[in-house]
Amino acid sequence: MTRDRELQALLRLTAWLSPAFPIGSFAYSGGLERAVADGLVTDAALLAAWIGTLVGNGSVWNDAVLLAESHRQQAEAARLAEVAALAEALAGSRERHQETMLLGEAFLAAARAWPDEVFRRLPDKVAYPIAVGAVTGAHGIRPEKALAAFLHAYVSQAVSSGIRLGVAGQRDGVAILAGLEDHITEVARRAAASTLDDLGSATVQADIASLRHETQATRLFRS
């Protein structure tokens, strides 16, 4: 039975963080589109560095810390509300706020196909990492696994965005995914042991790119 539960958890995690899960993440680049337009990301190597830095030291790291906290607090409605408010406040731009809130709303709507009391405990609208953390925690998925899948999904989407923006090819994209595996693993483990005191980022260029994207005239992405 234990093995069956582990397989069930794997199937659910795979479904929830699959590109096919209907949350619309393909519409967002998290400022990457502006970074490409500004010449900050021009090839596959720079794309890999950009993504890796965000995962380890940027907004994605903060998302991982918030996910871990909501995973721990999934049974406490009051604590979930507090961390949800914090996650929303940490969104560094209008588009970043829109992105994380709409993804969170879409994730919860789709994840209700797997009924659980956690949906009653969560606020109606929450940031994406809060939604993922609370739902995976409620379904007994280990935090390291939830975090690794969440980070891998982000990297995959960012790579896809880079390909669509013309700074990398498909083989480059696969190589980036392979090359960032160890980094994803390390960050997932670090985030699983984190507390809210570990929140913080050092990716000023990425934050500025996210802000500048708001006034970009020609765009493929919503952020």
From Swiss-Prot:
Q: Which gene encodes it?
A: ureF
Intracellular or extracellular location(s): Cytoplasm
Protein keywords:
Chaperone, Cytoplasm, Nickel insertion
| Functional description taken from the UniProt entry | Required for maturation of urease via the functional incorporation of the urease nickel metallocenter.
Under what name is this protein listed? Urease accessory protein UreF
Task: Provide the primary localization.
Answer: cytoplasm
- Give the taxonomic lineage as stored in the record: Bacteria, Pseudomonadati, Pseudomonadota, Alphaproteobacteria, Hyphomicrobiales
Q: Which Pfam families match?
A: UreF
User: In this entry, which stretches build a coiled coil?
Assistant: none
Which molecular-function annotations from GO does this UniProt entry contain?
nickel cation binding
Q: Name one GO cellular component term.
A: cytoplasm
